[in-house]
């Protein structure tokens, strides 16, 4: 199961404050694990959006030291062909968020006996960072910024 997490900087108008706070994997893991977070019921107005990206990964892999993947004869064990190599490698990512595809857009109603519960309203009408994470492994799968 996947979950969508939206992060917004309430202290400034810049999304860079959120990006700066996620400068290491520990902070992302805390967010995914719900550590140091309070569960609160809200009414969320989240814009529908669809983002698509197509990235050439060859330069990134070479920069990380994986240059042998792109040389002939370096993929022995995968095929009998001695000249097998990776010519190019690309990653295409698409994320679509709408009222049908995200739990974050739903509102849970609850009844209380001690009066009317005031539920905060949050309108995501400013830039925000989002991540999609696997609930079981707590691994972020997609990370992006919505700028409207």
From Swiss-Prot:
Family affiliation: Belongs to the serpin family. Poxviruses subfamily.
Keyword rRNA-binding: no
A family per Pfam: Serpin
UniProt keyword terms in alphabetical order: Protease inhibitor, Serine protease inhibitor
tRNA-binding keyword on record: no
Protein name: Uncharacterized serpin-like protein FPV251
GO molecular function: serine-type endopeptidase inhibitor activity
Organism: Fowlpox virus (strain NVSL) (FPV)
Record SUPFAM superfamilies: Serpins
One GO term describing the cellular component: extracellular space
Residues making up the signal peptide according to the UniProt record: none
Domain of life: Viruses
């Amino acid at each position: 199961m996947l979950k969508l997490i939206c992060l917004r900087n309430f202290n400034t108008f810049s999304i860079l404050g959120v990006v700066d706070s996620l400068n290491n994997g520990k902070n992302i893991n805390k967010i995914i694990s719900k550590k140091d977070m309070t569960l609160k019921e809200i009414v969320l107005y989240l814009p529908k959006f669809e983002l698509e990206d197509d990235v050439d990964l060859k330069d990134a892999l070479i920069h990380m030291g994986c240059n042998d993947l792109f040389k002939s004869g370096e993929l022995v064990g995968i095929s009998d062909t001695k000249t097998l190599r990776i010519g190019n490698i690309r990653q295409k990512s698409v994320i679509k968020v709408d009222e049908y595809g995200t739990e974050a857009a739903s509102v849970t109603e609850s009844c209380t006996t001690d009066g009317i519960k005031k539920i905060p309203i949050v309108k995501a009408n400013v830039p925000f960072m989002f991540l999609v994470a696997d609930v079981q492994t707590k691994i972020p799968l997609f990370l992006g910024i919505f700028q409207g």
